[in-house]
Amino acid sequence: EINQPIVYCTPKPIYTIEDIRKFSIDPTDICRIPRDIIDDDRIWKIAMWGAPRDLELIGKMQSTFAPMASFIEENHMTTAEGFKRGNRKHQCYDFKGLPLVEAKSFKPYYVSSDELPIVDFDDFECIVKNAREIFAAPHLIIKQSHKNGTFLSEVLDYDAVFNHSLLGVHGNINKLKYLSVIIGSRVFSYYHILTNRKWLVERDELEAGDIWQTPIPSPSDAEIAEACGIFDELAVSPAKKEKAEQFVRHMYRLKEYESYQIDDVIDYVYDYFKKKQHSVS
C-alpha cells in the first residue's frame, strides 16, 4: 500500500558485562513514519533519538529564529576556525608571545591570561590570513567538542590565539556574552542532539557549519544587559547555571511542556548514549 507508513528501525548499541558490542532491537527502536513527511530530512535523526513532538519543537525553533550566521552578519562579526599546524610548512612570527587557548584545558566563560601558556612556536600549515580579528579582543572562543553533553565557550577581553579545534568570533563584547550564555545551555545541546547528523552517531563534536546554523533569538538591549549579568556570574561560578537556563528558555519562548521535552532528551537520551548500560534510562 502506497499510503502505508515507513517502518524505521534504529537499534542502539548495548554493552554486556564482557563489554562486547551487540545490537538488540527494542520496541522503542521502531517507529512508523507517515509517508507524507519522509522528504523532511530532519525526521531521521529525530526518529532515532526523539519523538514526534520533538520534530514540532525543532521546526518551531527553526521557523521562529534566524540562524546564528545571520546574527553574526547583522552584528558585523568576524568568524573562523583557529590556526592549524599540520605539516607546518609556513613560518609565522605574528603569534609569538601571545596567550594560547587550548582545547584540552579549556575553561568555560573566562580564563585570565596569566593562566594560559604562551606561543613559543612559529611553524604552521594555516595562519588564518583573512580573519585575523578572531584572535583580537573582544572575542568569543567556542569549543567544538562537548563536555558531558554541554558545549563550552569563553569571552576574552585580551588578544589570544587558538588552533582549528576552536572557533573564534570577534565582535561586540556584550553580544558575544549573550551568545556564550546560549551555547552553554541545554537548549543548545538539545537542538544539536536532534539535528546534527554526526553527533551521537559517529563524531563527538560539532562542525563550524552546524554551530552557525543554530537558531538564535534576536535580543533587546535589556535582554543583552541581562545576559551580560548572567555571563559575569557564570565566569565566577560556572556550575551555577539555573539562572542562565531560565533566561535561555525565556528567549526561545518555550512553554513548560517544551522545557520538559528538552530535559528528557538531555537526561535520558544523552545519558543513555554516554553511560551505556549504567544509564538512568
Residue ranges and their predicted role:
Residues 1-4:
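Conserved beta strand-loop-helix elements of the APE1-like EEP
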Residues 7-8:
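Active-site loops and adjacent core secondary-structure elements that bind or stabilize anionic groups
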Residues 13:
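N-terminal glycine-rich flavin-associated loop
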Residues 23-84, 96-97, 101-104, 218-281:
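Non-catalytic DNA-recognition/assembly elements of restriction-modification systems
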Residues 53-225:
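Polybasic, glycine- and aromatic-enriched phosphate-binding surface used to engage nucleic acids
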